[in-house]
Amino acid sequence: LSGIPVWSWDNWMKDKDRSGLVPFDLHIHDIDFMVSVFGAPKTVMSRRAGSESQDAVHALYEHDGFFITCDSAWYNCDYPFAASFRFQFEKGVVEYTGGVLHVYEEGGTSRVITPGIEDGEAHENGLGLPSSSGYENEIKYFVHCVLENQPTSRVPEEELKTVLSILRRL
């Protein structure tokens, strides 16, 4: 979820032909993660609502024995970027929202987990994770592949084809 990216050069992010709008700006990350972990879904059901002032996708992806729902949207205001997830398992729910990971266990117990902290020591960002960001690491890897003239090994070609096929149907 995010505000409309009004910061883009020549307003290209709001041009469907150049950017693909919400599916290719935000929803691609949901699908990429889903396909890399669970493989291609058996069925895809989606609803998309778009206008001059917003774009939104709600999708349900069915896999063998479970389903995944995803919501992605641009809002016509200064809405801060937000990423979250919720997984339901046989004996509980794991939810990441607002930078906090919660585990809600069967029987009513719950706890907060701080990813990456070992032996009580956290990095400067408080999460026990390197201070570099996902964006920074992604760009460094891309530059490395270009400079070394190497194909990417992190996203197999078949996964990429699956992700793009799903996106083009939204």
Language-model segments: what does each one mean?
Residues 24-27, 132, 154-160:
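Conserved loop-to-helix N-cap of the C-terminal "lid" that shapes the substrate pocket in Rossmann-like
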Residues 29, 53-56:
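Substrate-positioning beta->alpha
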Residues 59-61:
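Short beta-strand scaffold segments in enzyme catalytic cores
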Residues 137-170:
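C-terminal helix-rich "cap/oligomerization" subdomain common to oxidoreductases
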